[in-house]
Each structure stands twice: as structure tokens, then as C-alpha cells.
Amino acid sequence: MAPWPELGDAQPNPDKYLEGAAGQQPTAPDKSKETNKTDNTEAPVTKIELLPSYSTATLIDEPTEVDDPWNLPTLQDSGIKWSERDTKGKILCFFQGIGRLILLLGFLYFFVCSLDILSSAFQLVGGKMAGQFFSNSSIMSNPLLGLVIGVLVTVLVQSSSTSTSIVVSMVSSSLLTVRAAIPIIMGANIGTSITNTIVALMQVGDRSEFRRAFAGATVHDFFNWLSVLVLLPVEVATHYLEIITQLIVESFHFKNGEDAPDLLKVITKPFTKLIVQLDKKVISQIAMNDEKAKNKSLVKIWCKTFTNKTQINVTVPSTANCTSPSLCWTDGIQNWTMKNVTYKENIAKCQHIFVNFHLPDLAVGTILLILSLLVLCGCLIMIVKILGSVLKGQVATVIKKTINTDFPFPFAWLTGYLAILVGAGMTFIVQSSSVFTSALTPLIGIGVITIERAYPLTLGSNIGTTTTAILAALASPGNALRSSLQIALCHFFFNISGILLWYPIPFTRLPIRMAKGLGNISAKYRWFAVFYLIIFFFLIPLTVFGLSLAGWRVLVGVGVPVVFIIILVLCLRLLQSRCPRVLPKKLQNWNFLPLWMRSLKPWDAVVSKFTGCFQMRCCCCCRVCCRACCLLCDCPKCCRCSKCCEDLEEAQEGQDVPVKAPETFDNITISREAQGEVPASDSKTECTAL
């Protein structure tokens, strides 16, 4: 065996094991002494010990640290520091900051306006259909059906305020009882959360941002769904919301007040009313079975009218049909009387784009729907870009610490409740929970606000939107004051009950965990986000609606097995994660099921093949179609062919393969070869030279 190579300028390490004959400690120190004796230089000559060559046969995988995808990203500031700028640069930077602030406020203004126009577009497309849902008051006595109708109507009109006002009108007209209206209010609470979920889809381009944004949006959905699943059976059994609100209304003598204050609408209404104006009374009239309203258009044409009452002579079949005996006479063979007639005279038309087009409501709604979605998407992209350029370095650190930091011990538990108050106050200012949560979604996506902090803010928005409804109820006329106030209070106490269920105790904050799980799935399979929207906001409510119309026997016969299977799967999943040993070996995992029943990979392949033929055409059309293609096919480079998805997957698989770390090689020569410092063919030469 050849002697070990000696390296200059190396110290022997006494802690290292040096291989010798028969596995004993070699006499390296003696050799070192001899070498030192023969060395003519005064500088000490040292050696490095090399571990045995056979030790390189077993390579050790270095454990890779997996970053938590929910950690907030560090927004690095790559620009020039303020202290390093000259006077001209500081002035230019100052005006750039002012310009970015103006642009941010401008895009935020158009973002809010696009949400308002989006709501109007949905009302034009599905407003009359929503009114017809309420027209059959006999089926509203079914609480489950009332819940589903509340969800569908609010999704169609994109406004919980509109659906709530319809319910108030029906209750004040004695077409609906408060008891039957409470499930509808619960459904409206669910339906209004679809808006910020749609907004989250606009951040689908970046996987990490989409994971956070979609989870931040759907935490609102899960809170509402879980609250309904628990509180609806409790309300049906005890009617506690109806009893509490009735006691409150009867205990206080409320008087009619002034109209609810318009805060944000004062700024947005001058612009939105130039686009379109709607006559929202038509939906309420359809809900109250007014046949004349079915032929009316929701697009408002005349904004200024004059109503005049006059008396005219009319003929009647007999004197018994006269309005009054003193106002009845006979002229030959005809009987005459005087009747009060109301004339409505149109004076001035409204000033908006569609006032003179005379298009059907569906056409106007479709146009506004497409345009509002384009503006919404564009504004959101620009808001994210501007925030990303502003919130960097020290600014981002200060903002994230201010928003996400808890109070010092022992008052840390108060931080979340303060966030609830902030969310309620901000929602009261903007007068819409959809606007507040939709504005919150991009901030969650870019990593300024954590999911844990966004959760109490969202709960506060639920409270804030009910306070606006209470103020609006206090401004109602005398005949509708009592019913509208009781319904608004039902909405308020429903959200308070939900907060008491899913917030005070940390382990009960299930919406956060469920939203994070859905965010992880949607980030990996981005088409699943659209699937979630369709299933939870359309297919499930429509299925329950159809089964309810078929009768309670059909509903129970189909619903009970489905609920039983869901509960069984959840219990089995809980046992698999907590104590799998109590289960049979076959049930300790889901491998006994076919792959398509336990994984989304087969479904992802089907969706990719289905969208592959449309991908190239979609990418060549426009940027908006390109984003839709990215959403469906999970492809961030959609301006290429469908092969880019496969390339991306191969690249990700290549990154997932554990790489042997150079430090784990036992032989330093092999380690240097792995690092590329020494070619493999020259390793022997280097050892000889040493």
C-alpha cells in the first residue's frame, strides 16, 4: 500500500482517527518529527490526515431544511439607500414616492368602483332570477332551503345588503316571518364571501402569493360555513336568535332616524352612477309577486319623475261598483263614477352610459361583468406591483412588525380582539365587508399580513357589516322599522356567536388550518381553486335546493348517507394522524383506495390534457386569456406551448432529488471532485504531486 500523501501547511488533528496497519493508530507523529528534523526552514511544516478511501463508498444524504411556505417573505430593498443619494436623487426619490402614493390611491379607487359595478352586473344578469327564488314563500318555511336560497341569491347579486333588504321588505309586508328569514340571513353571510375569493384568483401567477392570498380569502368562507353548520341546527331547535332579538326590540322604543351615513359611497357614487344606475326596487317587487315588475328593466332610465293624483270619470258595470253613492250616476245605458288615478310623469333622464341603448338586462349585465372583471384584475395587479415596490427593506419590516406583532405579556391575548375592532371599524367606514376583505387579500398575498392576523380582521368585517345594517334599519319607515331592526340584530348576534365558537380558544380556530390546507392544494393544483368555487357556491347549494323541492324524504335519503360517509372519512383521517396503531394495518393509510380516489394527480392529468389544446390559442389572444389559461392548466409560462408544464414538473423533480453535500464525503479528494475544483482524471496526479 502506498504511503499517505503529506500536505504542507496542515496541522494534525488529534480528534481525528488516523488509519494505520491492522486498524491501529499510525505513527504519524513520529513521521512528523522526522520530517521536521530534515526540514531546513524554520517555519513549521504540518500535515493533514486523510480518511480511508473505502469510506467514500457510503455517501450520506445531508438533511435539507424545508422552508415553511407560510412564513412571510423578506422583501429585499435593492435600491440605493437614502444616505447614499445626493440632493438631486433625494428630491427625485421624494417625488417618486408621492407619485406612487397617488397611483396607489387611484388604483384602489377604481378597484372599489369595479367591485360596485361588478355587483350591479350580477344583479342585471341574475337579479330577476334571485327575486323569483323569494316569490314562493311557501317553500321558505324549510330552514335548509332558506339557507340555500340565501347563498344563491347573494352569489347572484354579489351583495348581502341587497338580499337582506329583500328579506326585510318581505317581512315588513308579512310575506315572510322572522323565523323563516333567519336561515336566509345565514346564507347571505356565506354568499358574500365569494367576492374576495374571486379577487384571490387574480394572484394566480405566483405560486407562493397565490397560496397565501387564496388561504386568506377562504378563511372567511370556512368561518361562515362552520358557523352555519353549528348554529343553524341550534337555531332550529331553540330559536335563540329570534327570542333574543325580539326581547331587545320590545325593550327599547326605537324611533325613526335619518338615513344611514354614506362614507365611501360619497366618493365612489359620482363615478359609478355615470356607468350604470339600477332600479333595485324591481327585485323586491318580483319577490313580492308583483306581475308588472317582471316586465320592467333593472336599468334605470328616468331619474326625475312627477307623480300626480287626479279624479276621472269611468264607467262601471253597475251602481254597486261605484266608489261612492254620491259619485255615481247613470247616463243612458252606462253607469258612471269618479275614480282617483295616479299619473307618473317622466321629467328628466338619468345620466349614464346605457340610458339610451335600450339593451336587455342580460346584455348590459354581460358587458359590465366582463369590463368590471378586467378593471378589477388590472387594478389588483397594479396595486400588488406598487405595494411590492414600496414595501421593501426597512419600510416592510416596520409595517409587518406593527401589524403582526402581539402585545407584550400578559396582554398578548388582547391583540386579536383589537384586530377584530379594527376590522369592524374599517368595514363600517367602507360600508361593505366585501370591499374590506377584497382589499385585504392582496396584502396577504404579498406577505405583509399573516393569515393569523387576517383572521380576526375578517371576523371584525363580519361585525362591521351588521352595524351598517342596524343603522340602515333605524332609518327605515315606521311599518318596516321593527322587522328590519330585528333581522339586522339577528345577523349581528349570529356573527357574535360564530366568533365565540371559532376564535377565543386557539385550538378552535379551525378556519385557519382548513384555509391553509386548501391554500397548499390550490397552490399545487391551481385549477382546484375554480373547482372549489363551483362546488361550494353553486353545485352544493343547487343540489340541496333540488333535493329540498323533491321532498324531505328524498333529502334525508340522499343527505344522510353522504353526511355519514363524510363523518366516517374525517374520523378515519383523524385516527390515521393521531393514533394509527388502533387501526388495522390496511386502514392506516389510503393506499387501499384507487389512485384517483386518494390523489389529485390523475385529475390534474385530465385537466391538463383538456386545457392543452386551448392553451396556445388562449395565450395568443390576450394577456387576460393567458392568465385564465395559467389558472386552468397550472402553467406560469403560458405563452409557450403546453410542454412548458412538463418542463416545469421535470425541473421541480430535479430539485427535489437530495444532493450529496461536499462536506459529507470522507475523502477530501473526492470532496473536491464533487465541488468541481479538481477533474476526476487529475485526482491521482494531484495526490502524487502532493
UniProtKB/Swiss-Prot annotation:
It is found in: Apical cell membrane. Keywords: Cell membrane, Disease variant, Disulfide bond, Glycoprotein, Ion transport, Membrane, Sodium, Sodium transport, Symport, Transmembrane, Transmembrane helix, Transport. Residues 122-135, 234-362, 429-485, 547-552 are extracellular. Induction: Down-regulated by EGF. Glycans are attached at N295, N308, N313, N321, N340. Residues 1-100, 157-212, 384-407, 507-525, 574-689 are cytoplasmic. The chain crosses the membrane at residues 101-121, 136-156, 213-233, 363-383, 408-428, 486-506, 526-546, 553-573. Residues 30-40 have a biased composition (Basic and acidic residues). GO terms for molecular function: phosphate ion binding; sodium ion binding; sodium:phosphate symporter activity. GO terms for cellular component: apical plasma membrane; brush border; brush border membrane; membrane; plasma membrane; vesicle. Residues 1-42 are annotated as: Disordered. Highly expressed in lung. Also detected in pancreas, kidney, small intestine, ovary, testis, prostate and mammary gland. In lung, it is found in alveolar type II cells but not in bronchiolar epithelium. Involved in actively transporting phosphate into cells via Na(+) cotransport. NCBIfam families: 2a58, Na_Pi_symport. It is linked to Pulmonary alveolar microlithiasis: Rare disease characterized by the deposition of calcium phosphate microliths throughout the lungs. Most patients are asymptomatic for several years or even for decades and generally, the diagnosis is incidental to clinical investigations unrelated to the disease. Cases with early-onset or rapid progression are rare. A 'sandstorm-appearing' chest roentgenogram is a typical diagnostic finding. Belongs to the SLC34A transporter family. This is Sodium-dependent phosphate transport protein 2B. It comes from Homo sapiens (Human). The lineage of its organism: Eukaryota, Metazoa, Chordata, Craniata, Vertebrata. The gene is SLC34A2.
